[in-house]
Amino acid sequence: MQFKQDFFTQLPEFYSQVYPQGLSHPQWLAWSHDAAQLIGLTQPTDELLLGLSGNAAIDGATYYAQVYSGHQFGGYTPRLGDGRSIILGEAIGPNGAWDVALKGGGPTPYSRHGDGRAVMRSAVREFLVSEALYHLHVPTTRALAVIGSDMPVWRESQETAAITVRLARSHIRFGHFEFFCHSERGRADKLLQLLNFTITQHYPHLSCDPSGYKAWFLQVVQDTAKMIAHWQAVGFAHGVMNTDNMSILGDSFDFGPFAFLDTFQEDFICNHSDPEGRYAFGQQPGVGLWNLQRLAQALTPVIPSDDLIAILNQYQEALVQTYLLLMRAKLGLTTLDKSTAEQDKQDLELIGQFTVLMEKNQLDYAQTWRQFGQLDPRSQHSSLRDDFIDTHQFDTWYKAYQLRLGDVTDIAAWQTERNSVNPKYILRNYLAQEAIIAVEEGNLAPLQRLQQVLSQPFAEQVEHDELAKRPPDWGQGLIMSCSS
């Protein structure tokens, strides 16, 4: 790997230098060839294993943990930072640079009495979801690899330590800006330095002046809205949408007790540490705006409040338009025959009515959408109908859907298009759990198989049909722990 060190050299007050503590008896558990290509790598090697497990220095790496703060479950925590993630620098790839981070690399000055380690189960989950979201076309950070070990660590019980090697276009979070506004009062110079660095590195088409700052914040608002719209369309619940887990670039980031929906449930909670459902699936769009408002508060020293409010008011439109684009594709609604505002309203109602029916009839979210690839929309008797207990309500909705859809002349092409946007395979929690159990038993084959299947989520892959089935009773709607 070839590194540059722009963050390290230009922002010395934004991190602490710290070196990883090596894993004992490291071994490759997972490797993403797609992600490896981003930074010019091909195969996992013994030399790379030693370096990424913290047992040998990597040429050009600097090793540091970033400092930031954030709002966690609505309350401000003035000092957080990378408690178990150590960044090596920005690896230069064929199409740009990517931060390389060792998540689970050992304690840092921000570990807050923690051991700085990640357990194998959380490392595998983060790897799988990073790559699964990417192949579902959801904006996300990436995962290069998982490195296992025989090092014992204690959570609720004894587990083994592992490292997820994360790739990110940037590790700058909303919480970085909050830290230098709230926790380090009187350091507006540092806030401005961070803002100028972010724009120069990631928004080079913008200028570092008042007009450029406003254009940048608008881009952040729109990118965040688009990311969350993708979550809602694909049925993804993040679980811990604290502001320190929000990427400034609008990439899905810092995965913990996440879940993809099994049966559709608007108020689904995937995190057992969130009993009130602050971060429930249906709350995510509102939380996204709330988090952006906290970011806006941190930016008041450099952007006038009136401008920030005006830009925040554009969040809803960006969210709705992206969501409509994605959901129209899932339904095959490709024509607009009325004024945009009126059609948008009617389409949102049509989509909302369908998801309400899905929830009322306890239908599997992914499987139901996938059936549109076998649907003949010209037929008066939908193949979907038998899945609904309340067939009368479905018939009413289906007539409205057919009316909105209009004429479909090439059924085969229409069905192929539906299958290209409605995945057959998603990362169900029970599948991840089965793969983790197999790894614990020394068997990597189920993990490798799951990774391969999730890299082609829209393909039929009939030999893997069982991975598309609804979960067994024990795996339905699993709620995960934050411990990792």
Curated annotation (Swiss-Prot):
Q: Which GO terms describe its molecular function?
A: AMPylase activity; ATP binding; magnesium ion binding
Q: Reply yes or no: does the keyword Acyltransferase apply.
A: no
Transferase in keyword set: yes
Q: Which Cys pairs are S-S linked?
A: none
The UniProt similarity line reads: Belongs to the SELO family.
NCBIfam families the record matches = PRK00029.1 (NF000658)
Q: What is this protein called?
A: Protein nucleotidyltransferase YdiU
Protein species of origin: Shewanella putrefaciens (strain CN-32 / ATCC BAA-453)
